[in-house]
């Protein structure tokens, strides 16, 4: 693919690029490259010709409407690769990092967010003028069929993966009710629905926002993109800021459409619920099945958004809300309640009963085998005791093997926790196993949990699986 991009670049400029640099991937199967030279361009390679054609058509249409999007300069004969403007390296998501991490957005961050949200009505209405929606991919419009696609995406790729039991017929009834509510929110005049209008898909160059990743856009309700932007899982916007940005949006919307704020909010909440479920479906597929870390890390944030939505209630969808409430209360989503803190799960277990499964989906951490350490369980006086009992503790510490063992595991775990804190990760799992999950593993897990809780400002979820002990040590 890079050879195709280099050929396109040479045909366009008359010379080869100075270098080709692979860029981090996102949620799709497209690959991105920076081709440095005069000029520097972004190369895109996709697996779907139809998806690429949609982006190229929309880019050219939006440019004709004087909307800030990257220009497409060259397309390969097979339609799978193309070159577009390089908008730099600053995404809106990166530029609001301080606010996202602290929950306190400064004036510069707020001004930038307001500039972006005021751009949205232009995209929705001016972008729709003269647009051939038949060229949109994979759907022409937001309709009954596409809504049910997304709801079933959530059901099969996320809800079923959690293990929550539910009645298919009752859930489908509420899906249908939500579908009808959403269809009623459509405007009679054409509105372009960006679909994934969120801070990762906004680049900022010379202080001005530019739009990328709009190839999934279609005709749809104006509420959807507001929901996508303001309820982005990891954006961490406080409700007061959301209200400010809604006011900015409604003010910018006036030249195109007049709508009372109360009416707008009453319709928006249903779209926010739908968008949250759609996002969880994507996180389930991209995270649980494709094992992409960014999506797994975003799940606790989306769960917290859902938890807040359910507090307001949706009497129109009683069974759906009941199922969602049970889902948000699952143990694997406990970290979402303390989403600014890392949660480390420390567990003891018996190898006879299998290695514990990481229910967070993250798959990060260690499984330490304690079976090489001198076993108190071999002696009659300790067989009925556990690694929490004083006689077993004294035996292990006097023997000394476990002290040396834990000196090494502490060093590994401490470095891992420190790095996860620096990178803003939400979950790490540390397991200690022995033959019966009673003596050595219990002592080791207890020691490690207390050590981590004392040393770091983190939540420690301590589980002695075979002893049926489950304890959450909250960050100090």
Model-derived segments and spans:
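Juxta-kinase regulatory segment immediately upstream of eukaryotic protein kinase catalytic domains
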Residues: 1-17
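An alpha-helical support segment within catalytic cores of ATP-dependent transferases
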Residues: 5, 128-140, 150-193, 262
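ATP-binding glycine-rich phosphate-binding loop
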Residues: 15-33
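Active-site acidic catalytic loop and adjacent metal/ATP-binding pocket
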Residues: 31-35, 123, 179-226, 236
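ATP-binding pocket architecture of kinase catalytic cores
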Residues: 33-149, 153, 160
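Active-site activation/catalytic loop segments of kinase-like enzymes and analogous catalytic loops
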Residues: 152-161, 222-258, 273-289, 302-309
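ATP/Mg2+ or Mg2+-diphosphate-binding catalytic cores
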Residues: 281-337
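C-terminal accessory "lid"/substrate-recognition subdomains
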Residues: 334-428, 468-470
